[in-house]
Amino acid sequence: MKFFLSLKDFKGEKFVLRSELDESSAFLCAISPTCRYVLRDEIPWKRLQRNVTSESLTDELIVDLLCGRSESKHTLQLVVLENLCRIYINYVDPFPLRIAWFELEQQALKDHEHFDVLWECSHSIKDLALASMAQQKNELQKLMAYTEQLQEECKSRERKLIMKFADMIKNARNNEDNEDNHHINYEDESDVGTDEQKQQEGVNSSAVSDTDESAVSDEFMQIKEEFPMKALSASPTADASPESAGEDDSHRRSSHESSETVSE
């Protein structure tokens, strides 16, 4: 895979660092408008010169730096010397420190070199763009699939919640109906008890009436035995005698008065 980086030296001269990397080898080429510097090395880096021992400077990190991937603690710096060029790897935390570098040998610049670099750069950009688009498409498909999965889970949970609420409403209605039926049954039992009580009261009242009637009948029979029928039959005449007696007295008095008048 080919990668292109834009670098500047201390004088501000512009360079293009072209890196061709595979599993076991690397080709580095720094090109300016006037010169060209080249380095061929193997991976692991045998021609890398280290200033200090750093465990963090691994082969993977060096490849990432040459490919242009951002790394917050390490940077690349190009310095042009006599007949060579150095690509320094700086450790910037807490202050810039050159921990390793590559030395590229100067070579003659060919007339068609710039065109080849531009052509390779355009194709590299195209390949990177296509690879990036393919990666984004793959990520988008995964995201769409994950979104559909979430939608299905949401629908399933929604259905479960609806069924749960429906069961709760159904149970509540059943409980309400059971309470109403229990209340109605209780009222019916109360009515039945009231009717039975009324019937019992009616029976008791009829028994009392019968008892009273029998008592009156017994009393009447006792009176009948004590007083003869003549007395009972004469009692109305006796009751009516005062009026008739009064009438007889008045009649007698008038007759007596009339007789006295005649005698005179």
Swiss-Prot record:
Identify the GO cellular component terms for this protein: chromatin; cytoplasm; cytosol; DNA ligase IV complex; nucleus
**In its keyword annotation, does this UniProt entry include Protein biosynthesis?**
no
The listed locations are: Nucleus
Bias type Basic and acidic residues, positions? 173-186, 248-264
Give the knockout phenotype: Spores sensitive to ionizing radiation.
Region Disordered, annotated ranges: 173-264
Q: Which UniProt keywords apply?
A: Nucleus
Share an example GO biological-process annotation for this protein. Answer: double-strand break repair via nonhomologous end joining
Polar residues bias (residue ranges): 200-209
Q: How does it assemble?
A: Interacts with lig4; the interaction is direct.
The entry assigns this protein to a family as follows:
Belongs to the XRCC4-XLF family. XRCC4 subfamily.
Role this protein plays: Involved in double-strand break repair via non-homologous end joining (NHEJ); the repair of a double-strand break in DNA in which the two broken ends are rejoined with little or no sequence complementarity.
Which protein, by its recorded name, is this? Non-homologous end-joining factor xrc4
Per the UniProt record, the source organism is: Schizosaccharomyces pombe (strain 972 / ATCC 24843) (Fission yeast)
